[in-house]
Design a protein with these regions (language model features):
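Sec-dependent bacterial lipoprotein signal peptides
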Residues: 1-15
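Bacterial signal peptide processing site
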Residues: 17-20
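Amphipathic, heptad-repeat alpha-helical segments
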Residues: 62-94
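Short, exposed beta-strand-loop hairpins at the edges of beta-sheets
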Residues: 120, 197-216
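Central antiparallel beta-sheet cores of small beta-barrel/beta-sandwich binding domains
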Residues: 163-191
Length: 224
């Protein structure tokens, strides 16, 4: 375990929409089994939930959706808790408030998405994970390196099983994204809009914004 680097903090803010320019990676290797449990970010409905903001003053389509949806409202409240806790830390990034305002603008752009609810949900889950991963003093998981059939860029996965949504950070060259556990009939699967990562019997099949990769974990790559 290592302290999360500042490099990941910059890259993750672009993760939700970042798309790579060219493909990457080759060959074969070994098995690094990581078995995430199913995410549990949103509690089951037990009654009305109001978000952290006044729904009578909702200023965007995204906020109106949050006010009408239990799961989104629960995510909004969780984000408000995580953000307030980070903002109160003496070592909090000086631009944290500005970044949060930037995130709100990004969330509100979900009106352009084909699946608006999925877009808003992923925005919340991603922002919560960003704040937790980049929290001062937070421990980051060691990266697992892979050899892929296209070797033009390095490919790694870092797993954060102690965080709310048990996310992973997928890195392909200079592009990064936060992805989340998804149901799988067998093996392990993570994903988000535009990305799918499936690992079964030691081999990973990846779709990274349209780039298809077949990868094998590199033995003894925990300190990459």
């Amino acid at each position: 375990m290592k302290t999360a680097s500042s490099l990941i903090a910059v890259a993750l803010l672009l993760a939700a929409c970042s798309k790579p320019e060219t493909p990457a990676e080759p060959a074969a290797a070994e098995t690094v089994a990581v078995e995430p449990t199913a995410p549990a970010a949103v509690p089951p409905p037990t009654g009305p939930v109001t978000p952290s903001f006044d729904c009578a003053k909702a200023q965007s389509e995204a906020e109106t959706m949050v006010c009408a949806d239990y799961g989104l409202a629960a995510l909004d409240n969780r984000l408000a808790e995580v953000y307030a806790a980070e903002l109160a830390k003496p070592a909090a990034a000086k631009d944290l408030a500005a970044r949060q305002r930037g995130w709100v603008k990004g969330r509100d752009e979900c009106w352009k998405a084909d699946d608006k609810k999925l877009c808003v949900e992923e925005e919340y889950r991603t922002r919560i994970a960003e704040l937790q991963i980049n929290s001062p003093g937070a421990m980051a998981a060691s990266a697992v390196g892979f050899r892929c059939d296209d070797n033009s860029k390095p490919f790694t996965m870092a797993y954060y099983n102690d965080l709310d949504d048990k996310p992973a950070v997928i890195t392909f060259g200079n592009d990064q994204a936060i992805i989340f556990p998804q149901p799988a009939a067998s093996g392990t699967q993570y994903g988000r809009k535009g990305i799918t990562y499936r690992e079964h019997q030691g081999k990973a099949n990846v779709d990274f914004y349209g780039i298809a990769l077949e990868c094998m974990p590199i033995k003894d790559s925990a300190n990459l």
